[in-house]
A protein has these predicted regions:
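Functionally constrained cores in energy, signaling, and assembly domains
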Residues: 10, 33, 70-71, 142-144, ...
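Charged, low-complexity surface patches
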Residues: 47-48, 148, 176
Length: 249
């Protein structure tokens, strides 16, 4: 199967392993010209992770090198913990301006080193995530579907982890959630709420005292949600089909 590497990279993110892994599997199977001009752009919120470095390692195994790398800070949308930050009306204009410059760099085939995660930041991220990782397996236990759900199936179509199945017109989660927030951000009815039950996690063997973040993980209908206004649910669904097609090979 042939596609363009640009199509895959548009959805590669560093902090959400499912999208990274799905992209990785697809890229590993791509046939790429050894002379290709390969670019990557990370779009972090507060801290730039290791998305570009992950891609670099994948391509290195294919004897390929990234020609151009850059980063653009955007809106953090992990709405289970905090509202969209910085406010879109403040950050998006700056983001668009920088993206326009990056687009011109790419058109001109400029060379630029990829952004790399700071050692101190990486150590902090690794320490934090190591505590949260055991919870990730049960993270979707916190999702609650309200009566506002109309059974449209948008959540299923945009979930890159194939974690949602529509049964009797209601979404059912299958314990493979990677917390990308696509389902809650694109739900037209805001019918997906969230609150983890600590007692339920304890029954699963999770020491909730070590994972303090779960105490503040909460989402209600009134909670603010955010997704890129230029990316539709249909486009995400299309990307998901690309990932799935590679997994079937």
């Amino acid at each position: 199967m042939k596609t363009t590497i640009e199509a895959i990279l548009t959805t590669m993110v560093g902090g959400r392993p499912v999208t990274r892994d799905a992209s990785a599997r697809a890229i590993e199977k791509l046939k790429i010209n050894s002379k290709a001009y390969i670019f990557c752009v990370a779009m972090p919120s507060f801290v730039c992770g290791c998305a570009c470095e992950c891609l670099e390692n994948i391509l290195k195994n294919k004897n390929l090198k990234i020609s151009y790398g850059n980063k653009v800070y955007s809106v953090a949308n992990y709405c289970l913990v905090y509202p969209p930050l910085p406010p879109a009306k403040l950050i998006v204009p700056r983001t668009e301006k920088k993206l326009n410059k990056i687009a011109h760099d790419i058109i001109e085939r400029k060379k630029r080193e990829i952004p790399r995660v700071n050692f101190i930041v990486k150590k902090k991220i690794d320490k934090t995530m190591s505590k949260y990782k055991p919870v990730l397996k049960y993270a979707d236990l916190g999702f609650k579907i309200t009566d506002d759900c109309i059974g449209c199936g948008t959540c299923d179509r945009v979930c890159p982890a194939n974690n949602i199945e529509i049964i009797k017109n209601k979404p059912v989660f299958k314990n493979k959630c990677e917390q990308c927030m696509a389902c809650v951000s694109y739900c037209p009815q805001k019918a997906i709420e969230y609150k983890l039950d600590e007692n339920e996690l304890k029954e699963k063997g999770i020491d909730t005292k070590k994972v303090k973040i779960i105490k503040i993980m909460k989402l209600t209908k009134k909670s603010k949600r955010y997704h890129n206004p230029y990316i539709t649910s249909s486009e995400l669904a299309k990307k998901k089909k690309i990932y799935n097609s590679y997994d079937k090979q």
